[in-house]
């Protein structure tokens, strides 16, 4: 792979990562397809994906930085409004705990058995079905805003997040659907999902990066930097656009799109 082509690949995959990481469509499925079409796969591609995910994480921090600092009691001299900042670090810990425990226990097994195209294809379909269930059978909204979310609901979202350990299922799809099925509004469930993503993705990406450290070299820096920066910028735009769209749109189009991507995976890798 020439240097110019490597930078092109980094730019394209950065766009794909930034667009899909926080939408309920599975970034893994998209990265597998696009990486294959670009001829970029294998151990280095997996490490590259981990690095550019950090760009997407940084985008969440940039969008929700006041909330994130508020979790640890830092408000930059501003007094929180009535009812504001009741979302606490306890909510985040409860949301993280199930996936952290199960993820650490079966991390190696997941890497060995669930990263194939066929299993990702099934996960895309399963995640799409969950989105439809969440839209069609969700109960009446009991938690309208982020600050209305209870500890019980946070733990429930954490349990749903375990589904995202299955590559292709979509972490945001699992957590947002879980939140809606527990009576959280679509908007609040999405916001909680994004905030919860920061510690979860930092932990997961940090672990993967540590295990892949021998694959990194300074020669890869330009490619990784382009992918990281592109993912950050695109993810910023995607997050803000998504939060605006879900005020008036449901998740059925995302479910249908997942089925289309699953069919594409079938055509490219399975058929």
UniProtKB/Swiss-Prot annotation:
Catalytic activity entry: di-trans,octa-cis-undecaprenyl diphosphate + H2O = di-trans,octa-cis-undecaprenyl phosphate + phosphate + H(+)
Gene Ontology BP terms: cell wall organization; peptidoglycan biosynthetic process; regulation of cell shape; response to antibiotic
Keyword annotations of the record: Antibiotic resistance, Cell inner membrane, Cell membrane, Cell shape, Cell wall biogenesis/degradation, Hydrolase, Membrane, Peptidoglycan synthesis, Transmembrane, Transmembrane helix
GO molecular function: undecaprenyl-diphosphatase activity
EC number: 3.6.1.27
Transmembrane portions of the chain: 5-25, 45-65, 86-106, 114-134, 149-169, 189-209, 226-246, 251-271
Membrane topology according to the record: Multi-pass membrane protein
Major enzyme class: hydrolase
Subcellular location: Cell inner membrane
Any one GO cellular component localisation term in the record: plasma membrane
Purpose of the protein: Catalyzes the dephosphorylation of undecaprenyl diphosphate (UPP). Confers resistance to bacitracin.
Family: Belongs to the UppP family.
Other remarks in the entry: Bacitracin is thought to be involved in the inhibition of peptidoglycan synthesis by sequestering undecaprenyl diphosphate, thereby reducing the pool of lipid carrier available.
Official protein name in the record: Undecaprenyl-diphosphatase
Species of provenance: Aeromonas hydrophila subsp. hydrophila (strain ATCC 7966 / DSM 30187 / BCRC 13018 / CCUG 14551 / JCM 1027 / KCTC 2358 / NCIMB 9240 / NCTC 8049)
Lineage: Bacteria, Pseudomonadati, Pseudomonadota, Gammaproteobacteria, Aeromonadales
């Amino acid at each position: 792979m020439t240097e110019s082509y490597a930078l092109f690949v980094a730019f394209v995959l950065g766009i794909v990562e930034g667009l899909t990481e926080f939408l309920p469509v599975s970034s893994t499925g998209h990265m597998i397809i696009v990486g294959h079409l670009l001829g970029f796969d294998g151990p280095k591609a997996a490490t590259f994906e981990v690095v550019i995910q950090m760009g997407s994480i940084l985008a969440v921090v940039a969008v929700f930085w006041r909330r994130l600092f508020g979790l640890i009691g830092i408000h930059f001299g501003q007094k929180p409004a009535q009812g504001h900042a009741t979302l606490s670090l306890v909510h985040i810990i409860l949301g993280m705990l199930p996936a952290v425990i199960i993820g650490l226990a079966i991390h190696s097994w997941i890497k060995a058995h669930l990263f194939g195209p066929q299993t990702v294809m099934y996960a895309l379909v399963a995640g799409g079905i969950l989105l439809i269930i969440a839209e069609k059978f969700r109960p009446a909204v009991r938690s309208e805003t982020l600050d209305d979310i209870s500890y019980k609901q946070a733990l429930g979202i954490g349990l749903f997040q375990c589904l995202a350990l299955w590559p292709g299922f979509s972490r945001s799809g699992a957590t947002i659907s879980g939140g809606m099925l527990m009576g959280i509004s679509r908007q609040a469930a999405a916001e909680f999902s994004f905030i919860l993503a920061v510690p979860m993705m930092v932990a997961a990406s940090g672990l993967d990066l540590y295990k892949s450290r021998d694959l990194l070299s300074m020669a890869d820096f330009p490619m990784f930097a382009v992918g990281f920066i592109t993912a950050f910028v695109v993810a910023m735009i995607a997050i803000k656009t998504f939060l605006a769209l879900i005020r008036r749109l449901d998740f059925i189009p995302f479910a249908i799109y997942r089925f289309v991507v699953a069919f594409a995976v079938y055509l490219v890798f399975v058929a």
